[in-house]
Curated annotation (Swiss-Prot):
Side of membrane Cytoplasmic, spans: 1-37, 96-120
Motif (Prevents secretion from ER): 117-120
Organism: Sclerotinia sclerotiorum (strain ATCC 18683 / 1980 / Ss-1) (White mold)
One GO CC annotation: ER to Golgi transport vesicle membrane
Taxonomic lineage of the native organism: Eukaryota, Fungi, Dikarya, Ascomycota, Pezizomycotina
Family named by the database record: Belongs to the VMA21 family.
HAMAP family for this protein: VMA21
Topological type in the membrane: Multi-pass membrane protein
Localization annotation: Endoplasmic reticulum membrane; Endoplasmic reticulum-Golgi intermediate compartment membrane; Cytoplasmic vesicle, COPII-coated vesicle membrane
InterPro entries the UniProt entry points to: Vma21
Keywords: Cytoplasmic vesicle, Endoplasmic reticulum, Membrane, Transmembrane, Transmembrane helix
Lumenal face of the membrane: 59-74
A GO BP annotation: vacuolar proton-transporting V-type ATPase complex assembly
Its job: Required for the assembly of the V0 complex of the vacuolar ATPase (V-ATPase) in the endoplasmic reticulum.
Name of the protein described by the UniProt record: Vacuolar ATPase assembly integral membrane protein vma21
Length: 120
């Protein structure tokens, strides 16, 4: 069984366009939330770890290639891979600590809110 799509004129005749415009006016009367979805300090932290993920492994490869491993690119590449994993583990640790601190702040705020309600 096929369904029909109603054209713009059919919707106007049915009064759906007026309902939509009334809803739009109601929404426009409210203040919109223009705050960013992610706080700036998190973006800066992510950018820092992104740069570290690029710079540290590449620099460790070239620094160890001729100075420590005397031209052995396999060991220098392994060093770069290890350093990339070190940066990754560092990011995970920082992210977990930040998540825990946000949870503690939320719990403290909730606790103060319940205490203030009890006082009233």
């Amino acid at each position: 069984m096929a369904t029909q799509r109603r054209s713009h004129n059919d919707r106007i005749a049915a009064g759906e366009e007026k309902e939509a415009s009334f809803k739009a006016e109601a929404v426009l009367g409210e203040k919109s939330n223009i705050a960013p979805a992610v706080p700036a300090h998190i973006i800066y932290k992510l950018l820092g770890f992104t740069l570290a993920m690029i710079i540290i492994p590449i620099s460790s490869y070239f620094l160890t290639l001729n100075s420590i491993f005397r031209g052995n690119s396999t060991f220098a590449g392994a060093t770069a891979a290890i350093m990339a994993n070190v940066v990754l583990v560092g990011y995970v640790i920082v992210a977990m600590k930040e998540d825990q601190s946000e949870a503690l702040e939320a719990a403290a705020a909730k606790e103060t809110k319940t205490e203030s309600k009890k006082e009233l």
